[in-house]
């Protein structure tokens, strides 16, 4: 996982297996990388519950699989809070795994700022798998 700022802050980018000759290939906003870390290996189930409002309020849904388009799936674009029970997940600001990325580990995220976002808009999300 690459971060634009020191101490794992700023825009984050998860690089899947492959080649990235320039920052635009990983959909970066610029070529500045100030910190990075490996994502932990996960083997087993994936489970996450998302909520339409903060503090785990409002309509919610559980997911075990990837979702390429949140609006098509459940008719809202904003995710205000979530619980990640199992596995590591990546939120994307736009559908089809595009735009700003937010890496989520197991834990509680009471508001979108807890995963580093400046807005609640999430267009897609997927499980983080390690390719061997």
Swiss-Prot record:
Name the domain of life.
Eukaryota
Q: Explain the purpose of this protein.
A: Crystallins are the dominant structural components of the vertebrate eye lens.
Question: Known PANTHER family for this protein?
Answer: BETA/GAMMA CRYSTALLIN, GAMMA-CRYSTALLIN-3
Q: Identify the residues that the record assigns to the Beta/gamma crystallin 'Greek key' domain, covering every copy.
A: 1-40, 46-86, 87-129
Give one Pfam family, short name only.
Crystall
Q: Which segments carry the region annotation Connecting peptide?
A: 41-45
Task: Report the protein name in the record.
Answer: Gamma-crystallin-5
Give the species. Answer: Xenopus laevis (African clawed frog)
Instruction: Set out the biological process GO terms recorded for this chain's protein.
Output: lens development in camera-type eye; visual perception
Entry-linked SUPFAM superfamilies: gamma-Crystallin-like (SSF49695)
Which keywords are on file for this protein?
Eye lens protein, Repeat
